[in-house]
Structures are given as C-alpha cells and as structure tokens.
Amino acid sequence: MRVLGIETSCDETGIAVYDDKLGLLSHKLYSQVKLHADYGGVVPELASRDHVRKIVPLIKQALLDANTSANELDGVAYTKGPGLIGALLVGACVGRSLAYAWGKPAVGVHHMEGHLLAPMLEDDAPEYPFVALLVSGGHSMLVKVDGIGRYEVLGESVDDAAGEAFDKTAKLMGLDYPGGPRLAKLASEGVPAGYKFPRPMTDRPGLDFSFSGLKTFTANTIMAEPDDHQTRANIARAFEEAVVDTLAIKCRRALKQTGYNRLVIAGGVSANTRLRETLAELMTSLGGRVYYPRGEFCTDNGAMIAYAGLQRLKAGQVEDLSVKGQPRWPLDSLPAVD
C-alpha cells in the first residue's frame, strides 16, 4: 500500500509518500518560522493562508520525488486534529478533495498519534508494548502503548506543555522565535551556578505535568539577577535541567507502573540533546532502551502522517465525504487497529 500524507496542524506544511514495502519514498517540508518571527509566535490566520499557498506545489513535488502518480496511490492521509482549526481545514480540504477526485480512500489522522508512531519510520523501530513520552509545544503526555490505537494516557500537562514553557521562557530572556531551540543552545553555554529550580509535581504521586509555575519561578530569577550573557546562560541551563529532570522522574514512574522496559520519546522537544541523554541514562540504569525519531521527524512532518494513515487505511478505517477538523481530540478516544 502507498499513501500520500499531509500535515498542516500548525506552522509547517509537510507532505510525504510512504509505501509499506519500500518505506518512505519522499518527504517535503516547508516551515513558516520566518513568517511568524516578527510576531514572536504563530499567527493562526497567517499560518492558514501560507498553507494554502504552499500545499499544492509541495504535493506535486513530493509525488515527483517519489516517482509516483495519483493512480499508484492507495489512499490519502491528512492531519484531522488537534491543532489550529484554520490550518487543519486547509490540509483536510485538499486531502479529502484529492482523494475524491482520484477515487481513493482518505483518512484523518490524529496529530499526536503521528508523533507517537514517528519512531516506526526508523530501521530499528520499537516493538510493542512501550511507554511513550510525547513532548511538543502544545502537549506533554505519558501514554501506555499496547498497539496502534491501544492507548492509555497515564499523565498529561495540566497547564503549560514542556515545549510551550521552553518558548515562553525564551521570550522572557529576549531570545528570537522559535525560542525553544535557542534556549537549549544558550543553556549549553551555562554552568551550574547555585540555582535551585523546582521540579514541578514530583513531590506528589501521579504522572501529570505542570510547567507554568516553573516558568514564573524562572521569570522572577531573571529579574533578580544581573543582565549579562553568562548569567542568562546559567539560568537557561537551570531551567532546562529542571524540565528534563521532571520529565525523567515521571518517565521512571510510568515505566515502574506499567512494568515496561521500552520508552519512546517523540514531538518537537524530543530533539533536545539533554533530554535524550538523560533518558538514555535512565533506560540504561533500568535495563531498558529508549527510542526516538531522527531530528527531521521530531518536529511536525508529513512522513509520520503518511505512516499512521497507512496503518488505519489498511485496517479499513476511512473518512466519509465531509471535511472535518478537530482542534481538540483525546488521543485515547481513537479506535484500535487489529
């Protein structure tokens, strides 16, 4: 089976063609970072309009790169949610329309399921079952995964997600958008300097996350300390270590609770070097293993949507002719793939 995947949930237009026998045949990505940089964050209306401009040329190029015609496709997968409704509808309208015109089935994919399954694009993919840590700008969650669609959310963010906390803290430090990667780079120049940052919600049972208080603590520290580069770097490191330690503590608890020894990390924050190193050390100490996608598949992309969509199309799950977007969509409400 060969599927065209379309991702437009936020500020990246991602298109890919995936074949269940040959693997990933093409992968195109356009990022709107420069478009939104002057605003310090994503402007939904601008994001939607830019998707409209870029999506069809990218689809044509992806098919050309994959040496695939519409007749050779077996289906179309597009991100149905969660995300920005305007951006979602661009991908849904184009994906559903092309599928109808080509006489192919279409399926709407859950964006976070795409991230969760992104490590399956690698040669050394994890086997089920495993615990997944999904960390992005909009989500932080721990999920017990027993198969595709067999998900139990063990814990999630009750306010700011990890990626959101990175971006907001970076803005407090005067760093340009997108702030998360820039804050991580600044943190790499920092040294432990006696700052004692909290590890939120680790002093109580449970697997939920909360990073808004840590963000406020960091803001107060910034205002109280000298405004020089090294001090900012030290604060950035203390903040990053607090986030990473919190995520690691919760992962350890989730692994103990489930009895699993495989951990998957995915989503934009999974590209963070300190997080990868810390979780690798954790899994080594537990006699387990951590898996994550390559860097280009940590952020939003069409490849993960094509892969996830193919699994559901193979199981006979298809959309009707209506075009729908779901800005909010619980991951554990998805049907299982037998």
UniProtKB/Swiss-Prot annotation:
Q: Where does Fe cation bind?
A: 111, 115, 300
- Report residues binding substrate: 134-138, 167, 180, 272
Cofactor (UniProt): Fe(2+)
Gene Ontology molecular-function annotations: iron ion binding; N(6)-L-threonylcarbamoyladenine synthase activity
Q: Tell me which Pfam families the record gives.
A: TsaD
**Protein localization:** Cytoplasm
Q: What is its EC number?
A: 2.3.1.234
Which reaction equations make up its catalytic activity? L-threonylcarbamoyladenylate + adenosine(37) in tRNA = N(6)-L-threonylcarbamoyladenosine(37) in tRNA + AMP + H(+)
InterPro entries, alphabetically?
Answer: ATPase_NBD, Gcp-like_dom, KAE1/TsaD, Peptidase_M22_CS, TsaD
Q: How cofactor binds (record note)? A: Binds 1 Fe(2+) ion per subunit.
Q: Which cellular components does GO assign to this protein?
A: cytoplasm
What GO terms in the biological process aspect are recorded for it? tRNA threonylcarbamoyladenosine modification
Gene3D superfamilies noted in UniProt? 3.30.420.40
| Primary location recorded for the protein, binned into one broad class | cytoplasm
Sorted UniProt keywords: Acyltransferase, Cytoplasm, Iron, Metal-binding, Transferase, tRNA processing
Q: Does the keyword Cytoplasm apply?
A: yes
The record's listing under HAMAP family reads: TsaD
Give the family, as the similarity comment puts it.
Belongs to the KAE1 / TsaD family.
The protein's job, in short, is: Required for the formation of a threonylcarbamoyl group on adenosine at position 37 (t(6)A37) in tRNAs that read codons beginning with adenine. Is involved in the transfer of the threonylcarbamoyl moiety of threonylcarbamoyl-AMP (TC-AMP) to the N6 group of A37, together with TsaE and TsaB. TsaD likely plays a direct catalytic role in this reaction.
UniProt name for this protein: tRNA N6-adenosine threonylcarbamoyltransferase
Q: Which organism is it from?
A: Shewanella denitrificans (strain OS217 / ATCC BAA-1090 / DSM 15013)
Source taxonomy: Bacteria, Pseudomonadati, Pseudomonadota, Gammaproteobacteria, Alteromonadales
